Amino acid sequence: MKRTFQPSTLKRARTHGFRARMATKNGRQVLSRRRAKGRKRLTV
């Protein structure tokens, strides 16, 4: 059985990247929450 995590930088950026977050209203909410919390990295 193969492992479930097969890392791909491009897929990772497209689903969890900054532009992906900015594309939707909820994604922008995620960013604002992370800013409020003081996260060093907002996205991947």
UniProtKB/Swiss-Prot annotation:
Q: Name one GO biological process term.
A: translation
- Write out the coiled-coil annotation as residue ranges: none
Origin: domain of life? Bacteria
Compositional bias of kind Basic residues: 31-44
Task: Quote the Pfam families the UniProt record gives.
Answer: Ribosomal_L34
Q: What keywords is this UniProt entry annotated with?
A: Ribonucleoprotein, Ribosomal protein
* Gene3D superfamilies given in the database record: 1.10.287.3980
Q: Which GO terms describe its cellular component?
A: ribonucleoprotein complex; ribosome
Transmembrane annotation, as ranges: none
Which GO molecular function, any one, fits this protein according to its record?
A: structural constituent of ribosome
Q: Where is this region: Disordered?
A: 24-44
Please give the PROSITE patterns that the UniProt record associates with this protein: RIBOSOMAL_L34
Q: Which InterPro entries would you find in this protein's record? A: Ribosomal_bL34, Ribosomal_bL34_CS
The entry sums up its family as follows: Belongs to the bacterial ribosomal protein bL34 family.
- By what name is this protein known? Large ribosomal subunit protein bL34
This chain is encoded by the gene named rpmH
